[in-house]
Structure formats: structure tokens, C-alpha cells
Amino acid sequence: MITEGAVTSADGTRIGYRRLGSGPALVFVHGSVSTHTDWMRVAKLLAPRYTCYAMDRRGRARSGNGRSPYLLEREYEDVAAVMAEAGPVAALIGHSYGAICALGAALRHPVPRLVVYEPPLPTGGPIAGEFLDPYRRAISEGDLDLALEIGLSRFTRLPAEAILAIRVSKAWPRLRTLAASWIRELEAMDTLDPSVDRYAALDCPVLMLVGSRSPEHPLRDASRALAAVLPGARVETIEGQGHMATRNAPEQVARLIESFLNT
């Protein structure tokens, strides 16, 4: 059974989540232009053995947007609030921008175990860079299809055939509704310190997931840089997959997560 719940973050913002399963707690944090649904296929596979909390980050679904200006620090606080609800032994699991949020939260509020799937840290240069202005312009002009094509091709570096497949899928209307929220997250990523040395302070077992077909920048290069400062981290490749294995290969992702949790 899936139930809905919510917590109040440090700044008073309501953060919603879906809860399912029973057993040790897991908290899932989704990436940009997405919601808790990105993790639900994985969560349903793990629910027979774990209590899964799939949160909605601020500004989408049942979570509030918070006050301006937007700060990544508020995202860390949101994650910490859900972790507090899940309990002190909850493992934290983040994908993409959600992995950046999970890393930041874990630095400030220690967690027993951490899983990160391709955090787009700017180790090899800006994530959006010169393409952020065209993206903003497309959003301001209401051309959400163009904005998403810019974002998927220039920010996540997806090949044309992958973008076409997404555009004709049921996911495209949902991406359109979230396209504007990507701006503030891209701005936040491009202002991050490109050095990942700060993450060496993490004092917990870490699993890093990397898609074998993911682009070099900003995903594989950032994962390599992060692994270099976390020599004890376990790095697992999701064979035959890129950045969206949570949806496209949930069985592989769930299996790798559970293997890590059981060691």
C-alpha cells in the first residue's frame, strides 16, 4: 500500500512524500524536471523488504515552492527533514540533481549509508554555461518544447534519438510542466565549487551508480572525480543504460542498491 505524507522543512516549506513497504527505511531523492515518480519503479521492487520514502523536492507535486531566492541549502534541509521522519538508520539515495541534494544533506546531517547516481557536479566545466540564456528565453516565450530540447541536448547531452523517444513518450507533458523549475537548479549547479574535495568528509559507506551509456560530461567525469576523493566508495556500472535507469532498468538499479545495503 502506498500512503502520502509530508514534513515541514526548516524554512516552513511543506515537503511531500510517498511511503510504501516495510523494513529498514530508504529515502529517495529525484532529479531535475521530475518528481517522486522517477523512483517509484525501484521503490516498488524494494518495498517487500524496505520502507521506502519517495519525496517530492520543493516546487513540484505536493511539495511547496518555498520563499525566494532559491538556495540549494534549502534542498539539503528538505532532504534532512524527510530523513528525520524516516528515522536514524535510514539510507539516503539520490539521482542526478537529487544526488547533489543528497550529498549536501549527508555532509550536514550524517547518514548511515548513501547511494548517488550520477550527480552532475561541474567538475569538467559548467553544466548549462552558454546555453542557459537560450533556455531561459525559450521558457519566457512559452516555447517549452524548444526549451526541453535545448536542455536535454545541451545540459544532459542526450543523443537525438533518445530525445525523440522522450518527446513521443507519455513523459513529455510532465516534463513540460516542470521545465521552468530547471532554470534555478541549473543556476545553482553552475555556481557550485568545481572541486569535490569537500565530499571527502563523508563518513559513511557510499555506493556510486554510473550508466555505461551516460555522456562523459557532466556525468561520467563528475562520478570519476567524486570516486577519487571517496576511495572507499563502491562504484557500480549499470550496463547498457544511461542516465535514466531508474525508469528504464529499475530491476538493475534495485539489485545494485540492495546488494550494497546487504554488505
Predicted regions and their residues:
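Glycine-rich His-Gly loop
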Residues: 28-31, 96, 211
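Active-site loop/oxyanion-hole signature of alpha/beta-hydrolase fold enzymes
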Residues: 41-44, 53-93, 97, 252-255
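Conserved hydrolase catalytic core segment
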Residues: 88-125
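Helix-rich cap/lid subdomain of alpha/beta-hydrolase
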Residues: 123-172, 179, 183-188
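Conserved serine/cysteine hydrolase catalytic core
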Residues: 174-228, 237
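Catalytic histidine-centered segment of alpha/beta-hydrolase-like enzymes
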Residues: 238-250
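Post-His helix in hydrolase/transferase enzymes
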Residues: 247-259
